[in-house]
């Protein structure tokens, strides 16, 4: 099982997810990626550009869980969990 850490941005997103009623869904995704960050399904995407090296999983139609895996230290860093489209 991998250790999950959160960026400051992702910590802020936790509050938004809770108020939107998405906390349980995110907890399930976090448990899944802690066991195997590359498990498919549910589907994940490799990101490109500024977020190259990160992965994205759908929370719902609007929000994504964006994370990076550091296998050498058994850690996943969650970058964000709120809107992937800039309309926070």
Regions found by a protein language model. Give the residues of each.
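A short, surface-exposed loop/turn module that caps and links secondary-structure elements
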Residues: 32-57
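Short, well-structured alpha-helical segments
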Residues: 23, 27-31
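Enriched for short, Lys/Arg-rich terminal
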Residues: 1-5, 9-16, 20-24, 57-64, ...
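Hydrophobic alpha-helical segments with strong N-terminal bias
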Residues: 3, 30-33, 52, 64
């Amino acid at each position: 099982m991998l250790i999950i850490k959160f960026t400051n941005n992702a910590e802020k997103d936790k509050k938004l997810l809770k108020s939107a009623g998405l906390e349980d869904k995110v907890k399930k995704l976090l448990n899944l990626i802690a066991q195997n960050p590359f498990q498919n399904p549910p589907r994940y995407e490799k990101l490109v550009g500024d977020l190259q090296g990160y992965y994205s999983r759908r929370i719902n139609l609007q929000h994504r869980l964006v994370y990076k895996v550091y296998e050498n230290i058994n850690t996943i860093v969650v970058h964000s969990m709120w809107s992937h489209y800039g309309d926070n």
